[in-house]
Swiss-Prot record:
Gene (UniProt): RPL6A
Protein name, entry field: Large ribosomal subunit protein eL6z
InterPro entries: 60S_ribosomal_eL6, Rib_uL2_dom2, Ribosomal_eL6_KOW, Ribosomal_uL6_N, Translation_prot_SH3-like_sf
Species of provenance: Arabidopsis thaliana
Keywords: Ribonucleoprotein, Ribosomal protein
One GO term of the biological process aspect: translation
Gene3D superfamilies hit by this protein: 2.30.30.30
Amino acid sequence: MPAAKRTPKVNRNPDLIRGVGKYSRSQMYHKRGLWAIKAKNGGVFPRHDAQPKVDAPVEKPAKFYPAEDVKKPLVNRRKPKPTKLKASITPGTVLIILAGRFKGKRVVFLKQLSSGLLLVTGPFKINGVPLRRVNQAYVIGTSTKIDISGVNTEKFDDKYFGKVAEKKKKKTEGEFFEAEKEEKKEIPQEKKEDQKTVDAALIKSIEAVPELKVYLGARFSLSQGMKPHELVF
């Protein structure tokens, strides 16, 4: 198909010489028909409102596309749900710890914290287990229960057991090769007093039941021939 011929634009007011047109300004006013436009709009030229400026985008579009397809991360709509407590664990239940530093120790369950962990204690005066948090996956609930109505556990939460983050200092060459043992971290006096208060309330309930103090002080273990799946705790 042949290309269409372009018609050259003709100037309505050709220049006689450079900068001087053939027709005057008033002649061009009538020649262009501006008088008719003015008469049509009540003797005033029509005005058009300025178009609103489009705001520049905050993020400029990418100039190049990635060579490989990039997976778009999905929105996580999962909401944290409170951890369901085992039916065998209720406030005052004696638990057996199965793992960790106090493996085999019997402890008293006080309450469940917001994180889902269990707040337990020995008491410390009987078997050396202080107030601590334990995951319910690592305990066995027994049928033995203790009255803990006299124990106040309102102040104990997850923040109570949190540790203060300390900035690590770079050791010099001399400090690195020193064989001196680091100083043991001392337990705050406030936590010691809290432990004594909880122990005092628990021991009153424990001493009211014969042989319960000896039971809590003894470590749980399996002897030869015992079948764990057949035991009744």
